[in-house]
Amino acid sequence: MNLSELIFKRLSADENLQTMLATYAGAPAIFDSEFPADQQEGWEGATQYPRICYRIDMQVNQERSSAGTLYVAMYTDKTSTIIEDIETAVKHCLQDVLMKPAGEAPFCVAWARTESYAIEGKEVWCKEMAFDILEYSEQFSTDPDPVLAVAAYIKKIFPETIVLGIDNVGDFVETSKTPVFYCRLAHLAHTTGHCMNTISWFIGKIAVHLIY
């Protein structure tokens, strides 16, 4: 599954959201990027609110050190007061979880902001949450590899944790239950040493992140 499919799976499997959202084709009303038309048979003539629409923008934000942004918009009619509960459920569902798309680096999301507004011409409220998408790309490079050495050492002393690059990761890891370590090369520079006519010396700084 790709990242969008993982997010859909995570949201649609949440029991709290299942009880609060409208249904479409027998499933919670959660959609990627756009809603089906109001006349679609999947609504089965029932209410179309509350519902959720999410989208992913994989544009790097260097200022926030993020690989992109996840937007989750929640819609309810103006007579409903459930939107706050839906917001809480979405946050709880997406926070403290590592997601591993097939063939890609693992990702986490971190809540950044929430904006509220009314839909013009409709009796509908919307709350849109923005999450920073944090990517944990593989950092291994040379042989012998200092990043791999640090990662292997951490796994040795904390075998109950997951160390990215050492352990195989499934679709989801709930980091509140299983802490995750991520090692990366933060800095690398030439330095001096003996036998410099035959040996190149480097000094490096390795950053260790604990995701929990």
Give the ranges of each region predicted by the language model.
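Small/polar-rich, solvent-exposed N-terminal microdomains that initiate assembly or binding
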Residues: 1-63, 92, 97-107, 136-192
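Residues embedded in well-ordered secondary-structure elements
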Residues: 43, 61, 120, 197-199
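Short active-site-adjacent helix-start/loop capping segments
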Residues: 61-64, 80-82
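Oligomerization/assembly interface segments of phage tail-like spikes and tubes
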Residues: 65-78, 124-136, 200-212
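Long, acidic/polar, low-complexity amphipathic helices and coiled-coil-like
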Residues: 67-69, 82-84, 88-91, 95-124, ...
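Short intrinsically disordered coil segments
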Residues: 69-72, 88, 143-149, 199-201
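Short, conserved charged micro-motifs
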Residues: 80-85, 141, 212
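An N-terminal amphipathic alpha-helical segment
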Residues: 190-200
